[in-house]
């Protein structure tokens, strides 16, 4: 069994928990692979934008708090899902999954968990997608 540990590359906040999960699963005898979400769907511009926004928000924590108070809601997640669930990114994911085998995904950010679930369902794949919220101050997808 191979588990893909998916993170959003915006700093250490999602990578470190994904790495910890990967290390523990490996210690238990499960094969794992660390996966950058934006590389899976081949979206380098979103990857760069996400990193720049997060670094900017770290410099201005009050702005980050105000933005994320509204951004980390179910309605916002649905809008993001719609944006990423385009045919282009689904095709990129399909191409990636043809060349890379995983039996399940564990995501440390809510956006990849929603999008990979949607893509897997749309493509008729039976790949379970698990979400592990590594954000300390917010609980995503709750209104």
Where are these regions (language model features)?
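Short hydrophobic segments within beta-strands
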Residues: 6-8, 35, 132
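Active-site and donor-binding regions of nucleotide-sugar-utilizing enzymes
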Residues: 69-143
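Flexible, glycine-rich phosphate/dinucleotide-binding loops
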Residues: 12, 41-43, 138-139
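Extreme N-terminal starter segment of soluble prokaryotic enzymes
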Residues: 1-4
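A short, glycine/small-residue-rich beta-strand->loop->alpha-helix junction that serves as a flexible
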Residues: 7-17
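Conserved N-terminal ligand/cofactor-binding loop architecture of enzyme catalytic domains
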Residues: 20-99
């Amino acid at each position: 069994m191979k588990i893909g540990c998916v993170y959003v590359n915006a700093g250490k906040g999602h990578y470190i928990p994904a790495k910890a999960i990967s290390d523990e699963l490996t210690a238990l005898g499960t094969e794992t692979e660390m996966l950058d979400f934006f590389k899976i769907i081949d979206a380098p511009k979103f990857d760069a934008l996400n990193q720049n926004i997060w670094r900017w928000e770290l410099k201005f924590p009050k702005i980050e708090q105000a933005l994320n108070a509204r951004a980390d809601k179910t309605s916002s997640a649905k809008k993001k899902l719609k944006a990423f669930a385009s045919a282009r990114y689904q095709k990129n994911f399909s191409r990636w999954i043809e060349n890379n085998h995983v039996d399940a995904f564990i995501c440390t950010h809510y956006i990849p968990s929603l999008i990979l679930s949607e893509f897997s369902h749309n493509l008729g794949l039976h790949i379970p997608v698990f979400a592990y919220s590594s954000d300390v101050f917010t609980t995503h997808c709750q209104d």
